[in-house]
From Swiss-Prot:
GO terms for cellular component: extracellular region. This is U13-hexatoxin-Mg1a. Residues 18-52 form a propeptide. Its main location: secreted.
Length: 124
């Protein structure tokens, strides 16, 4: 009886002392695969947003422009007159005012795409 109790205690100690890496590795591998998938989706989404916002315009914020349709972005406008314009957003410190400016610029840019070719032909 003492021998069976000793064997049982030794077995329990052996099981408790053995490493449990078999359970942790698949979880780490699964998390790494999920992270890689999320990073790929984020890159694809960023590229899709850039492609969608730059259908016509090819100039980024800070570059010179002639018409707003040259600027890349839904709310980015060509600020300035003639050939001295710069692609940028109109800014205000008021949050509600900024939302209204973004909405106005989006509508103006959308309507401006219809007459963009005519505006650019004047400066060529």
């Amino acid at each position: 009886m003492k021998l069976s109790a000793l064997v049982f205690v030794a077995s329990v100690m052996l099981v408790a002392a053995s490493p449990v890496k078999d359970v942790e590795e698949p979880v780490e591998t699964h998390l790494a695969a999920d992270l890689k998938t999320i990073e790929e989706l984020a890159k694809y989404e960023e590229a899709a947003v850039q492609k969608r916002s730059c259908i016509v315009g090819s100039k980024n914020i800070g570059e010179t422009c002639v018409a707003s349709c040259q600027c890349c972005g839904a709310t980015v406008r060509c600020i300035g007159e003639g050939t001295k314009g710069i692609c940028n957003n109109y800014q205000t410190n008021n949050i509600l005012g900024q939302i209204l400016l973004y909405a106005k610029d989006t509508v103006v840019n959308t309507a401006g795409l219809l007459v963009c070719a005519q505006d650019l032909s004047e400066y060529e």
